[in-house]
């Protein structure tokens, strides 16, 4: 049976009357049964998806919640309030292929009222507990994949409860594929202390780590744009050569001469034990080297003892001849500098791998971060800060669609402040118990105003607040015109043009006819009445703005009245609304066919 035929049959089983959940699970399991590596579970129906098959979301701004920075080049961040399947669907229209980094911290499905499905908490003894969680995640990750740029990366925090299931599901070709898997980070989020000590003494292997699954959409494994470093308390005694002013001596000899009263035996322990040795290394790091083999430099000719500095492939090598062959000197300074540990140490360091240690130390202060209360749900700012520092560019767009307390935005704004970046962040969260406004938004506002952060105000940031609103997919001509107006805020988000202009090419704007948004570098106009197109075309021809112009033009078809724009059509980007919106949602989540539903 072909996959398409199988999918249709499964859909009929799901909607058939007279079957209970066990019957459906058995039938679907029989259809899916095959000898292959992968995962089979019953895809559980979800109310949010069913709503989206009959309705389509738009984004509506709440302008009274906007925070505008005085800084002219301040990045604009976005908070979207709404069920995150609705928010993600809207983002497939505004940001498909535009998101560089996704970080999410989804519910771990502990059974302790952390995961709701169809408005009900999923209990630990629910037979479909894992199926519901996987169904929930697959729908959202499928949309997330559409949002990632070609070299985009997603980080997914998870515990051991669903790690194995999530890994197999993400490895499937329906989502990211095994070739896109980068690695799994092991994050030390707790220590064996307190109540865990008794459990450990009784023989229990206590849990200290959580996991972060990493996938790169394009399959690129080298996702670290910036290296992270952990402090190294011991000294590598291979770094035993002291080279200065052409004179080669030993580190032992030079340290003894500088600090004759210090008594020691093993150099490997000396860095940890002796503040004098740490001071000596810091002051002389430019002159300390290790001897190592080297290949690929047969074109270099040196006399015995001669040292030459060679630049190759963007890297500096210190080559010398020991009388038999070429060797290299490895500088200690490449392993010395500021570290990314909890203490923000400076000294000997090693490049961090997949073991991210000591984040349990941050947990003692995490409740104070952002100056909001969010029980058992916050991740440390330092954790997400370092993920972004490692993997993002300074102009990256970052998404978190399980925003919770808003740590991702807080971390991103801090990183921008530290490295001069202009990253933009989009947060999505629901409005359950007022979380979006009372916690997520409040924390962002606090951070911008300098409350609940380690290093003061983050005022050079602007913030816009949107909510999702559902509109019927079945459109009468009047409803289509209404949708074009209702979707205006979503078009602003799509084009990243937010400041409303009172004029467009010398014409006064009118909310019933045309609205215009832009910042001087580009303009977006939304035309609601086709009668004014000749006047708009004439204004464009007369003014010939030197910035890019996008015109969203109401049209009952997919033709944005191109012929009426005449000669200026080639100077602007013309898009018909609402067709461009409806077509996008139909590709992402086809509308429910009421006739077929009734027949099934």
Predicted regions span which residues?
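Conserved S-adenosyl-L-methionine
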Residues: 126-130, 134, 163, 381-452
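DnaQ-like (DEDDh/DEDDy) 3′-5′ exonuclease domain used for proofreading
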Residues: 1-103, 111-130, 139, 305, ...
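Conserved Class I SAM-dependent methyltransferase catalytic core
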Residues: 130-186, 441-448
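Active-site-adjacent helix-turn-beta-strand microarchitecture at beta-sheet edges
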Residues: 19, 202-205, 209-211, 218-369, ...
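Class I S-adenosyl-L-methionine
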Residues: 182-215
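Secondary-structure transition/capping motifs at alpha-helix termini
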Residues: 95-99, 146-152, 172-184, 390-396, ...
């Amino acid at each position: 049976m072909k996959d398409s035929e199988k999918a249709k049959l499964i859909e009929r089983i799901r909607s058939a009357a007279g079957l209970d959940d066990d019957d459906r699970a058995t039938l679907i399991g029989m259809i899916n049964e095959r000898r292959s590596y992968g995962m089979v579970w019953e895809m559980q129906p979800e109310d949010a998806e069913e709503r989206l098959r009959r309705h389509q979301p738009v984004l509506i701004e709440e302008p009274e919640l906007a925070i505008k920075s005085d800084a002219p080049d301040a990045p604009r961040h976005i908070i979207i309030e709404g069920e995150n399947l609705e928010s993600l669907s809207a983002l497939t229209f505004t940001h498909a292929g535009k998101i560089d980094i996704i970080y999410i911290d989804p519910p771990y499905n502990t059974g302790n009222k952390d995961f709701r499905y169809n408005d009900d908490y999923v209990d630990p003894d629910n037979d479909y507990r894992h199926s519901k969680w996987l169904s929930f995640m697959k729908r959202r990750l499928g949309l997330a994949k559409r949002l990632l740029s070609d070299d985009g990366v997603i980080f997914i925090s998870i515990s051991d409860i669903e790690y194995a299931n999530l890994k197999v599901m993400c490895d499937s070709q329906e989502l990211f594929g095994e070739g896109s898997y980068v690695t799994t980070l092991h994050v030390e989020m707790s220590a064996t202390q307190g109540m865990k000590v008794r459990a450990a003494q009784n023989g229990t292997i206590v849990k200290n780590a959580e996991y972060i699954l990493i996938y790169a959409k394009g399959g690129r494994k080298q996702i670290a744009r910036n290296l992270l470093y952990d402090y190294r308390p011991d000294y590598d005694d291979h770094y035993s050569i002291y080279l200065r002013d052409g004179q080669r001596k030993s580190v032992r000899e030079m340290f003894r001469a500088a600090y004759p009263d210090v008594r020691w035996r093993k150099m490997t322990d000396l860095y940890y034990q002796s503040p004098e040795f740490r001071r000596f290394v810091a002051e002389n790091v430019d002159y300390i080297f290790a001897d190592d083999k080297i290949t690929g430099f047969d074109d270099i000719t040196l006399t015995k003892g001669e040292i030459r500095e060679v630049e190759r492939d963007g890297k500096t090598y210190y080559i010398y001849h020991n009388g038999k062959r070429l060797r290299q000197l490895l500088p200690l300074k490449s392993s010395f500098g500021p570290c990314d540990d909890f203490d923000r140490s400076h000294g000997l360091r090693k490049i961090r791998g997949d073991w991210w240690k000591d984040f349990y130390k941050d947990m003692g202060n995490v409740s104070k971060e952002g100056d909001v209360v969010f029980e058992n749900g916050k991740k440390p700012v330092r954790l997400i800060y370092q993920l972004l520092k490692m993997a993002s560019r300074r102009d990256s767009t970052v998404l978190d669609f399980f925003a919770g307390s808003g740590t991702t935005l807080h971390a991103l704004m801090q990183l921008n402040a530290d490295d001069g970046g202009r990253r933009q962040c989009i947060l999505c969260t629901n409005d359950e118990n007022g979380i979006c406004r009372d916690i997520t938004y409040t924390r962002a506002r606090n951070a911008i105003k300098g409350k609940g952060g380690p290093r003061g105000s983050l005022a050079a940031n602007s913030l816009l607040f949107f909510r999702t609103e559902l509109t019927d997919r079945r459109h009468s001509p009047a409803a289509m015109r209404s949708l074009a107006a209702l979707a205006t805020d979503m078009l602003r988000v799509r084009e990243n043009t937010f400041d409303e202009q009172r004029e467009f090419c010398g014409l006064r704007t009118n909310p019933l006819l045309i609205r215009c948004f832009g910042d001087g570098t580009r303009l977006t106009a939304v035309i609601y009445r086709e009668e004014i197109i000749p006047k708009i075309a004439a204004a464009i021809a007369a003014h010939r703005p030197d910035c890019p112009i996008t015109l969203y033009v109401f049209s009952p078809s997919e033709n944005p009245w191109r012929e009426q724009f005449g000669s200026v059509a080639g100077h602007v980007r013309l898009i018909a609304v609402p067709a461009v919106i409806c077509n996008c949602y139909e590709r992402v989540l086809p509308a429910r066919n009421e006739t077929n539903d009734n027949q099934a």
